[in-house]
């Protein structure tokens, strides 16, 4: 058996090597000015580097994030008129020249249609799509660094999935399709609202939707504990229901994409990232969650091997694998009431991500199937959202309703279960 000090030195060398490779990866992504931040957000789902505070809840169309900028309204006008082939005065009776929301891809303006409806006009910044497409063609350059950092990772498949998802984000016509699909699915949902899309006023670079009044997350955080708990449960259940009941992974459950409507419903925004979860993957992921909840190391190992997470199964110890996954997934697995605050979120990230995670040797021997990349992103962003809300519930019991088809554990859960019984997708 190695001497403890020798083992400590070996671990320190491994940590230093991982940190150096992560820094090299960050530098490479930093050269990709258009897509770099988004690639890093998606790569954080592979658990190669601990997300920064900003990456835990990537900023959407709300606050002004680092690197985001507004553009003069004259350029916004040109994009709208070029894409919709009409003068802006014929498209809208009135439009605010100052945007009310900005992100790296574009900005959002409030407007009024000729029918008098107040709408949100999301306009892509000119040149952004071309810059991102150029970056995506260079994405293969980070593959060798990824393989050195995590030899078990199927870097080619992961990068192809990232390329596809980011390409989806810059296509507002595709986002409009996604939003119409979810708006139809959730139209009569008792607790959730999705704004309707004005298809005739939308294009590849312009997306016009219903404008929704309500409280943003910064205001929601000032509400009472009981209301924050309710909102947290609504958000958590909705994204789990979409994945496990509808087979649709909606990949952006972060604070800037949530509005509390005056009627108490939670309005969800931004559906650029959407991926169908096929029946085989869905069943396999459920089986993994059941095995984790049961603490069955060998069943977890077997299910993950079958799903493609373990390229060399013999190199991964089942007990170490179980410890790694139950540590990061504790909040979704453990039964009993838990209030999730920022301190708890920070602790989970420190345990689940290098360089501080004690499970990094196990992570390096794993990969993540492309179909599961957005699913993992949703889980991480939900944890961040619940931490922002300081929301409490028995998250383990709610999760078990989905992976083990347990009866609803709360009154709100019974209402949602009744909705899905009436609206199960065919």
Q: Language-model segments: which ranges?
A:
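Short amphipathic alpha-helical recognition elements used for nucleic-acid or partner binding
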Residues: 285-287
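Broad phosphate/nucleotide-binding scaffolds in NTP-utilizing and phosphate-metabolizing enzymes
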Residues: 1-240, 247, 260-267, 273-279, ...
């Amino acid at each position: 058996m190695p001497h403890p000090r020798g083992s400590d030195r070996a671990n320190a060398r491994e940590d230093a090597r991982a940190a150096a490779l992560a820094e090299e990866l960050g530098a490479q992504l930093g050269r990709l000015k258009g897509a770099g931040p988004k690639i890093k957000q998606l790569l954080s789902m592979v658990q190669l580097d601990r997300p920064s505070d900003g990456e835990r809840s990537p900023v959407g169309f709300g606050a002004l994030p680092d690197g985001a900028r507004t553009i003069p309204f004259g350029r916004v006008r040109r994009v709208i008129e070029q894409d919709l082939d009409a003068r802006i005065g014929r498209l809208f009776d009135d439009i605010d020249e100052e945007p009310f929301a900005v992100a790296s891809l574009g900005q959002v303006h409030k407007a009024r249609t000729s029918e008098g409806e107040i709408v949100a006009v999301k306009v892509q910044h000119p040149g952004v799509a071309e810059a991102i497409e150029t970056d995506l063609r260079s994405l293969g350059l980070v593959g060798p660094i990824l393989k050195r950092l995590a030899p078990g990772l199927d870097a080619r498949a992961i990068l192809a999935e990232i390329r596809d998802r980011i390409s989806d984000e810059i296509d507002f016509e595709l986002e409009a399709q996604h939003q119409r699909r979810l708006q139809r699915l959730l139209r009569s949902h008792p607790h959730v609202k999705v704004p309707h899309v004005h298809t005739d006023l939308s294009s590849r670079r312009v997306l016009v939707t219903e404008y929704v009044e309500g409280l943003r997350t910064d205001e929601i955080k000032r509400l009472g504990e009981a209301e924050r708990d309710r909102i947290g449960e609504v958000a958590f259940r909705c994204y789990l229901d979409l994945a496990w009941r509808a087979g649709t992974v909606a990949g952006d459950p972060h604070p800037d994409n949530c509005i509390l409507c005056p009627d108490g419903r939670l309005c969800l925004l931004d559906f650029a990232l959407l991926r169908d979860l096929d029946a085989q993957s869905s069943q396999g992921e459920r089986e993994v969650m059941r095995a984790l909840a049961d603490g069955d190391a060998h069943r977890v190992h077997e299910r993950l091997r079958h799903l493609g997470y373990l390229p060399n199964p013999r190199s991964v110890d089942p007990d170490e694998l179980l410890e790694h996954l139950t540590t990061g997934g504790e909040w979704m697995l453990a039964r009993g009431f838990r209030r999730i605050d920022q301190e708890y979120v920070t602790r989970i990230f420190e345990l689940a991500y290098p360089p501080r995670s004690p499970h990094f040797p196990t992570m390096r021997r794993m990969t993540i199937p492309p179909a599961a990349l957005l699913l993992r992103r949703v889980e991480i962003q939900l944890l961040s959202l619940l931490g922002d809300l300081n929301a409490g519930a028995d998250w383990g019991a709610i999760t078990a309703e989905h992976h083990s088809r347990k009866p609803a554990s709360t009154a709100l859960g019974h209402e949602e279960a009744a909705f899905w019984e009436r609206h199960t997708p065919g």
